[in-house]
């Protein structure tokens, strides 16, 4: 919370405690007398005039803040903010619960949602409200919510959390319920961009998520970033399902204003496309384009989000080694919850590099740095296929017993079955390091 917000919160709490708004000098004078009586301390009248905006405001001293908090019954500003946060959070949940129980949204509900959209955990309240209306089959209400640009408007990190909550909800719906949600929500661009783009559910590409993408493709503008996004993901799904006839989606379709992750995804898919068609020249040209992009002023972590795991998929060990040597720190840049699946991919890539170079003990140590309990979200099952794939290769270097190799193989196949990605065969597992 910013300092101006803290001061505003303190002003509101003081006036609640005082029992009336402080809008006039006379009211301020009465407040000063009560303040001195209750705290047995003094704040000058001019200081109070500045604090309540009767004079040009200045930053209040720590002594002024301490006395005002004392008036409210707190030892310091931290104690005040802690209690105020709990009160605000309760009021938000209480109001959100009331909205959940309504049959439709009125103007007052929408106004309240807009006014509170900047609260730290607002996305939780909004997702909970949407969940309630979905379970009650009030789809029109959800349409109204997504049509409000001031309500569904988050930072990148929060979009990921919001989309994660809704997509996990969609997993629980039966076919008829899911179809109704698709019919109502897919035509709304803000829904597509705030949910489908931020939670790519690899585990359910053959389920609800794939259904959403197939419906979203014809609903979007063919020249838009989202149309390319749907094409890339759906064709990538086809590759993982061993379906031939992948579409040619050239990187020339990338526009300057496209999000950096989408740009990286486009290059990633082209590596897959040219590999599938045994076009070494096309694959080489795409790799050179990737290297060119890495020399530009871009967010390398976001650009490489899909590329590293594609290189693992295609067994491009030399390229993985180059990236690890040149961009290791950049690839491990973010530390929040949304980035760990990429961290694990980079560590897998580093392990493969070391295996490829014959540094078996160091490969094992690097592999052991991966904390699988932190791999969560939409990439979890997909990442775990690669985790057990590399685990198997390391086990081979340590001359593991057949029963241990079989146990790893079964875990690998369990995730393959869960995703349906038949590209990952037993033969692929056992011959991975043989190019």
Pin down the residues of each PLM region.
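A short, Lys/Arg-rich alpha-helix, primarily the initiator
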Residues: 1-34
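Sequence/structural signature of beta-propeller modules
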Residues: 2, 66, 72-73
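Short coil/loop linkers at secondary-structure junctions
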Residues: 38-42, 75, 422
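Extended amphipathic alpha-helical coiled-coil/heptad-repeat regions
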Residues: 123-435
